[in-house]
Amino acid sequence: MAAAAATAPAAAVVRRMKLGSQGMEVSAQGLGCMGMSAVYGERKPEADMVALVRHAVAAGVTFLDTSDVYGPHTNEVLVGKAVAAAAATEEEVQVQVATKFGITPAWEVRGDPAYVRAACEGSLRRLGVGCIDLYYQHRIDSTVPVEITMGELKKLVEEGKIKYIGLSEASASTIRRAHVVHPITAVQIEWSLWSRDVEEDIVPTCRELGIGIVAYSPLGRGFFSSGAKLVDELPDDDFRKSLPRFQPENLEKNAAIFEKVNAMAARKGCTSSQLALAWVHHQGSDVCPIPGTTKIHNFDQNVGALSVKLTPDEMSELESYASADVVQGDRYHGTFLNTWKNSETPPLSSWRSGN
């Protein structure tokens, strides 16, 4: 049965939520903007993407996620233009832009103070803003004590160049060390029905420290929208074609997960993507998923996930479909950038001024 066979719920009112405990407020669902400019095939037409962002903001999704490495750089420029266009028509709407640093255009990871500052200045310029709402360390530099990186970020807060600090793909111990230097507002992690290893240590740590959780790839990089046939529709330069879970030997087995999710979605009168996204929303009021899309129709479907209600039994049933022993393939291939599993940094005592 095709994922679109079910009737999607009407668009929900997008509530506001507190992200973390430092005062940041965002829409309860964000918009991941990466695919508009990078990674998932060719860059999309700018006018279409500006229209999509304006549509999102008008619908109440005002939390936009980008990074300096998307493009590289072009996604921040796009988001900056879109926010300016939205502000011109939605005068009373406050948009929160989150961007990231730490992955160079050469796909190296850096967290040294000079790089942090230069990256921030570049993002401010490309976004066309005087202050970044939420600034994440995109990947953790395992050669630089996280306290050193955080020290520079703290200075940028004090200078009014960033408002809140976040981490992405950071281990629990790295989160704790960083939080001592300056409060962390949010940690961005991959969290979806088939990526749940963060629940063991990272999620509890965030909740203990009052840190908000931003879930990226909540639809399994599109898998829960259309299942195995997704790969057949991807262009050759789409990043997902290199991921272990999308390799033929794994995809054939993972297809059964989608079919079960899709069958439950049909019973509930929603789409498979709405069901998978609703599962993330039901993880707690401190969790903000940021599904990405390049199509207004898909955006509207994603907002509809806010109307899907799940019972504890339905949550458990969904989780059984995609348990760790069922999902085949890792999130990334072994040569990819640091993930939280290898994000430990040297002790602060090892750092000498001038490194």
From Swiss-Prot:
The active site is at residue 70. It comes from the Eukaryota. Keywords: NADP, Oxidoreductase. GO terms for cellular component: cytoplasm. It is an enzyme of class 1 (oxidoreductase). NADP(+) binds at residues 217-227. Coiled coil: none annotated. GO terms for molecular function: aldo-keto reductase (NADPH) activity. Belongs to the aldo/keto reductase family. This is Probable aldo-keto reductase 3.
